[in-house]
Amino acid sequence: MRLNTLSPAEGAKHSAKRLGRGIGSGLGKTGGRGHKGQKSRTGGGVRRGFEGGQMPLYRRLPKFGFTSMKSAVTAEVRLNELTKVEGNVVTLETLKAANILTKDIQFAKVILAGEVKSAVTVRGLRVTKGAKAAIEAAGGSIEE
């Protein structure tokens, strides 16, 4: 068996009906669109969210919240990712050099996920309580 010899089982595929090709086809003349009306015309149809003139749901509900732009430049770093860094000092620059963070990240926070095996010094990063305890238990330290 080769990839170029594969084909669907006999009768598994139905060919689509061609629209507007005579009354004998079953989908001639109006081509399944019915008679007249907005949906029968070329380019016809109502916009997304339109409810026939009734006040649509997206306008009935109040606006709320916003998207913080800070989230685009902030990242979380897992404990097990700290072992991928060269040396035993972890900073924002060393995390970027190890391809753990992208170049546009400006803030990072170490979170308790996975485990840290070696003693590392975390410098200039925010650290959660659980992650701080795990780093210090492994013999590491946190510097501001």
UniProtKB/Swiss-Prot annotation:
Question: What biological-process terms (Gene Ontology) are attached?
Answer: translation
Q: Name one GO molecular function term.
A: structural constituent of ribosome
User: Gene3D superfamilies annotated for this entry?
Assistant: 3.100.10.10
Question: Region Disordered: start and end of each range?
Answer: 1-53
For this UniProt record, the keywords arranged alphabetically read as follows: Ribonucleoprotein, Ribosomal protein, RNA-binding, rRNA-binding
Q: Where is the composition biased (Gly residues)?
A: 21-31
Cite the PROSITE patterns for this sequence. Answer: RIBOSOMAL_L15
Question: Any keyword Iron-sulfur?
Answer: no
Q: Is Secreted one of the keywords?
A: no
The annotated subunit structure for this chain is: Part of the 50S ribosomal subunit.
Please give the name of this protein. Large ribosomal subunit protein uL15
Q: Give the source species.
A: Haemophilus influenzae (strain ATCC 51907 / DSM 11121 / KW20 / Rd)
For this protein's source organism, the top of the classification is: Bacteria, Pseudomonadati, Pseudomonadota, Gammaproteobacteria, Pasteurellales
Q: What gene is this protein translated from?
A: rplO
